[in-house]
Amino acid sequence: MTRAVVIGSGPNGLAGAIALARAGLEVEVHEAEAQLGGGLRSAELTLPGFVHDVCSSVHPLGRASSFFRMLELDVDWLEPDAPAAHPLDDGSAVMLERSLSETAAGLGRDADRYRRLVGPLVDSWSAVERVLLGPYPVPPRALLRLGDRLGTRRLAAALHDSLGAARDFAEREFSDERTRAWFAGHAAHSILPLERRPSAGFGLALIVLGHAVGWPFPQGGSQQLADALAAKLRELGGQIRTSSPVDSLPSADVVLADVVPRELLRLGHGRLPERYARHLRTYRHGPGAFKVDWALDAPIPWRAAKCRRAGTVHLGGSLEEISASEWGAWRGRPVGQPFVLLAQTSLFDPTRAPAGKHTAWGYCHVPNGSAEDMTEGIEAQVERFAPGFRELVLARHAMGPAELEAHNRNLVGGDLNAGAMDLGQLLFRPVRKLVPYRTPLEGVYLCSAATPPGGGVHGMCGYSAARVALKDLERRA
């Protein structure tokens, strides 16, 4: 029987392992940590009974993933009443609603423009998803199908907008400062300066996802998604070995490595050709993250009551403020007043905390590897929009870049995307190669978020790498 070894049990490693097992290969996954899941792990970080997602919580791309849908995973997806909220200093909030029309209604004089920009993309979601989460290079048939749905001119405009900078897009397309700030909050998920390309594309993608599939999370924590993927693999005969670090590339017909480039270099022990190794050494990591988890005595007391309907809240005020925060993180400067992304899943999932209590987390972007403690800055931003928040904190748990990387080696310097996703590294990830998953070593493939389509919980990096491996096996047979 053809044997495959997968290094890493994050969503991409597990997705790749499942794809290989479905094709009849004997699959073994090695996970260095005692708990499987990579960025999908959950734990009681603060107090007993309070379940926190150690890294990722909200998974629009997980719901959108065609591979995850095909697997019919045993996961109970929960949806907040609204995907996201953006509170402002005047006590109001701008909302991303599931309904496009309800969202537009909250954008004032930008409502009609928003409908014209976003409506066609939402209506064409199935075709958009094939381009957004498909393999690299994007199959021509996927672009042709999207062109058929949108029309040639609208497709060209959508591609132009998606590859642009968020600040340029917001100032060109929207006239209301509230709308510009709201869009900037979505675009800042890119971990890019808003003046850098393609930050606009991240903002547009997350907004369209909010309308098309929502911003859901697994009941009981992200670990439930990891466990469901692991159960599917075991059902297919695959094995998972935890507390099983790998120090060199194993001998197998297929090796899928859910690792970042520098880890592949370490595992290769000089076996990789120098030209390829040189490209891997120049792979760039983006800013890191600083995250605080809270056990709370009650829900966060938002001044804007609408924020209580959202699973995710963006805390940054204006476009100018968000831009300054993201530039600071990118340029390696102290962040000062940080843009904070906050998740409050226990409002919609009572399994996350004891009766009447709640959990939440907030994180901000910081310079890669920064040792600065951002707890006070993050909590000040929450208090700014929710006076009395600090009085509700029963316990807190903070993780800076070093702690995040210790938790997951792929988070180099706290970089949540396993590599900067600016235009060059979005299109050529991790190297300029027609098939980026295939390494020069026969049978060895890279399948982490350092390959297309990049960061996020969707499993498509692993699935795409596995498909390449299976095609190569057929050719070698």
Name these PLM-found stretches.
Residues 1-5, 22-23, 425-435, 468-477:
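Extreme N-terminal leader/targeting segments of oxidoreductases
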Residues 2-133, 420:
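N-terminal glycine-rich phosphate/pyrophosphate-binding loop and immediately adjacent elements
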Residues 89-198:
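Rossmann-like flavin
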Residues 105, 262-266, 295, 354-381:
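Conserved FAD/dinucleotide-binding core of flavoprotein oxidoreductases
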Residues 176-193, 208, 337-341, 388-452:
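A glycine-rich dinucleotide-binding beta-alpha-beta segment and adjacent secondary-structure elements
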Residues 203-246:
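Helical element adjacent to the flavin cofactor pocket in flavoenzyme catalytic cores
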Residues 238, 242-353:
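Mid-domain catalytic core of redox enzymes
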Residues 447-470:
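A conserved FAD-binding loop/helix module that cradles the flavin
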